Amino acid sequence: MTDRDPIHDPAAMREHYRLEGLDETELAAHPMDQFTRWFAQAAQAAAQGVVYEPNAMVVSTADADGRPSSRTVLMKQYDEQGFVFYTNYDSRKARDLAANPYVSLLFPWHPMARQVVVTGLARRTGRDETAAYFRTRPHGSQLGAWASAQSSVIFSRAELDAAYEQLGVRYPEGEQVPVPPNWGGFRIAPQTVEFWQGRWNRLHDRLRYVAEPDGSWRVERLSP
């Protein structure tokens, strides 16, 4: 292609990243504590209109044959046990995780020149935990969980809207919506957590926590 507009040419796109670095001496002992620090800063940046949805993460899975797929979902909880998101258990990602529980998460905080990459194992949350979260969802989102047979082929948008409208009649605002039996959460127990900080001249800082058999974590610096 010789007529490519330079403005839209990915090879010509350049960004000079921030000067501040990330040093081993600044890290928390546990990766989830370090994540808490960075997530708080990302949330503050979101409040200032700099970052959009700091809890958005790219979830990458692979099926039993090793075929990968990725999608953006919203993290709804995190603690020392890992990261939690909710989905339809009939979706592609849930089917992948049933066959292959290894998963990767990516938090892309581009305006801050930061990203966090997590690898680990997924397991379903308990039904009590799922129900407790479902009750906090807006009424419309609760109906949406019933209306969408996620990842299935549908004839048209009108089909989806009609299903939603029927559910709205069945469960009007103010009436309790039951938790769909095929809907729930996954908790990702991290095995590695990498904190990436953009630096000048592409000499970025990459510090990765690696889980040890005794429950401790070691930190290693990766070449950019």
UniProtKB/Swiss-Prot annotation:
FMN binds at residues 71-76, 86-87, 92-93, 115, 150-151, 196, 206. Binds 1 FMN per subunit. Its cofactor is FMN. Belongs to the pyridoxamine 5'-phosphate oxidase family. InterPro entries: Pyridox_Oxase, Pyridox_Oxase_CS, Pyridox_Oxase_N, Pyridoxamine_oxidase_dimer_C, Split_barrel_FMN-bd. GO terms for molecular function: FMN binding; pyridoxamine phosphate oxidase activity. Substrate binds at residues 14-17, 76, 133, 137, 141, 202-204. Pfam families: PNP_phzG_C, PNPOx_N. PROSITE patterns: PYRIDOX_OXIDASE. It is an enzyme of class 1 (oxidoreductase). Its EC number is 1.4.3.5. GO terms for biological process: pyridoxine biosynthetic process. Keywords: Flavoprotein, FMN, Oxidoreductase, Pyridoxine biosynthesis. Homodimer. This is Pyridoxine/pyridoxamine 5'-phosphate oxidase. It catalyses: pyridoxamine 5'-phosphate + O2 + H2O = pyridoxal 5'-phosphate + H2O2 + NH4(+); pyridoxine 5'-phosphate + O2 = pyridoxal 5'-phosphate + H2O2. Signal peptide: none annotated.
